[in-house]
């Protein structure tokens, strides 16, 4: 299988995020996620650990969450809250990562968001 993109931790990409962590199929909404890690399965499939992103309720963050402001990341249309406590492994496939035949790698986590990301990671035991 050809990889759709070269994932790297800290990348913000668009995916068809499943609605539950137990779902085995892409979800109905194409949304931003933060890539946390990558892994190659024994069968050769590339998978990435992603954290859920939403533009809802960005003015308050629960433990394990941080917000990236669109003024700090021009590639985001709206402020986006990333929830590190809502993460899952997804295969890097067209079904999850493409819309209209294109993969959308938006950009990298901006420097101004690193402190918030580190705090959120610590709160959920990732650091």
Can you annotate each of these PLM segments?
Residues 2-6:
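Short, surface-exposed secondary-structure edge patches
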Residues 7, 24, 41, 61, ...:
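Generic detector of intrinsically disordered, low-complexity, polar/charged segments
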Residues 9-12:
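Loop/turn positions that initiate beta-strands
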Residues 22-30, 35-72:
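Compact nucleic-acid interaction/catalytic patches
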Residues 70-127:
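C-terminal terminal-subdomain/extension
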């Amino acid at each position: 299988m050809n990889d759709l993109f070269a994932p790297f931790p800290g990348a913000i990409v668009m995916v068809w995020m499943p609605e539950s962590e137990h779902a085995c199929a892409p979800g109905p909404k194409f949304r931003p996620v933060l890539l946390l890690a990558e892994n190659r399965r024994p069968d050769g499939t590339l998978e990435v650990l992603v954290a859920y992103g939403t533009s809802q309720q960005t003015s308050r963050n629960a433990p394990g969450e941080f917000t990236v402001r669109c003024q700090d990341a021009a590639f985001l249309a709206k402020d986006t809250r990333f929830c590190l406590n809502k993460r899952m492994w997804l295969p890097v496939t067209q079904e999850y990562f493409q819309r209209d035949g294109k993969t959308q790698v938006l950009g990298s986590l901006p420097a101004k968001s690193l402190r918030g990301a580190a705090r959120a990671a610590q709160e959920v035991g990732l650091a």
